[in-house]
UniProtKB/Swiss-Prot annotation:
One of its GO terms (cellular component) is cytoplasm. Keywords: ATP-binding, Coenzyme A biosynthesis, Cytoplasm, Kinase, Metal-binding, Nucleotide-binding, Potassium, Transferase. It comes from Pelotomaculum thermopropionicum (strain DSM 13744 / JCM 10971 / SI). GO terms for biological process: coenzyme A biosynthetic process. Its EC number is 2.7.1.33. It catalyses: (R)-pantothenate + ATP = (R)-4'-phosphopantothenate + ADP + H(+). This is Type III pantothenate kinase.
Length: 256
């Protein structure tokens, strides 16, 4: 079995694979001040809850956009699994040709998504990942990572609204019954939800003009399912796309 870590700015998503099958997945809050022992204790509890044993893990793969946590997770893996993790970064074999100005600056999570997306759906392809930031990644028919767009995530946008508008309350992000809100909460929910759907669809439509109208559009991330309900461009939601990509990257590097 292999253990994979997808470390984002808000959450750490973990998965355990037996071959190509995802047998367990968990979500923890990202905290760069937690120690390797604190994460280790959490993992012990999660493994036990899922009926798994930590000694079953034969390899670990890490993708992180929070550099301070890299060392913490390396220590975690060495102490609790007696393994050195494969950390996604420069020099790691992905199978993709990275066609951007500076390949070293692209986020590991975006490359991992592109690996899984192209393997599973082919290209041309647009992958929309709803995280702390909303990322749009373009992959060509030949499996080239072409770049993309980065926009503020829905949580960042709503937090900014609450922080700067003293009279506006915090609201839950849901699909409203109508775009015409009849009170402050409903009006905010309509603006947040449909504004975000419109942003996603407009960026995707412009990408498809450049990539070709036969471009597939896949979404992943925490709010993918909610936004896809109303989106005119998202064709499929794959909640575990990043975890699948980490497994694929492990397999491609294990064959070296």
């Amino acid at each position: 079995m292999i253990l994979v870590f997808d470390v984002g700015n808000t959450n750490i998503v973990l998965g355990v694979f037996s071959g190509s099958r995802l047998v367990a997945n968990w979500r923890l809050s990202t905290d760069r001040y937690r120690t390797s022992d604190e994460y280790g204790i959490m993992l012990r509890e999660l493994f036990a809850f899922s009926g798994l044993e930590m000694k079953q893990i034969k390899a670990v793969v890490v993708s992180t956009v929070v550099p301070p946590l890299t060392f913490t997770l390396e220590r975690l893996c060495q102490k609790y699994f007696n393994l050195t993790p494969l950390v996604v970064g420069p020099g790691i074999k992905t199978g993709l040709s990275i066609k951007i100005d500076n390949p070293r600056e692209v986020g590991a999570d975006r490359i991992v998504n592109a690996v899984a997306g192209y393997e599973q759906y082919g290209g041309p392809l647009v992958i929309v990942d709803f995280g702390t930031a909303t990322t749009f990644c373009a992959v060509s028919a030949r499996g080239e990572y072409l770049g993309g767009a980065i926009a503020p995530g829905i949580s960042i946008s709503t937090e900014a609204l609450f922080a700067r508008a003293a009279k506006l309350p915090r609201v839950e992000v849901v699909k409203p019954l109508s775009v015409i809100g009849r009170n402050t909460v409903a009006s905010m929910q309509a603006g947040i939800f449909y504004g975000f759907v419109g942003q996603v669809d407009e960026i995707v439509k412009r990408m498809k003009k450049e990539l070709g109208e036969n471009t597939r559009v896949i979404a992943t991330g925490g709010l993918a399912g909610l936004i896809a309900q109303e989106s005119a461009t998202i064709e499929q939601v794959d909640p575990f796309l990043t975890l699948k990509g980490l497994r694929l990257i492990y397999e491609r590097n294990a064959q070296r």
